[in-house]
Amino acid sequence: MATMTELEEIRHLIREFRDARDWMQFHNPKNLACSISIEANELLEHFQWKTPEESLAVTGEKKATIAHEIADVAVYLIELADNLGIDLVQAIRDKLAHNAAKYPVNKSKGSAAKYNEL
């Protein structure tokens, strides 16, 4: 018998959590996309007005809070992909291959320039 990957297990746990609360009726793609944005902005608040060094120096309770915000974004993202029938792992692989073509190492290494400015 094949074993579940960790992503499949997480997807299953998200479905169980949602379905036990009868929330599927609210979890349409538009609402999930909105929720991703809202949660991403809650994450962003933790770094607002911080220097790059300060943003790397999070510890303790602050780090745990940030981890929860990251998890909120991830949960909604995984559920959105699931609802739309998108294989998230394959989509990430495809996007990385696409970006590798747009940003070849010999032109983009050490540069923050956009692909059309390389």
Residues covered by each model-derived region:
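Flexible "arm" and connector segments at domain edges
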Residues: 1-70, 74-118
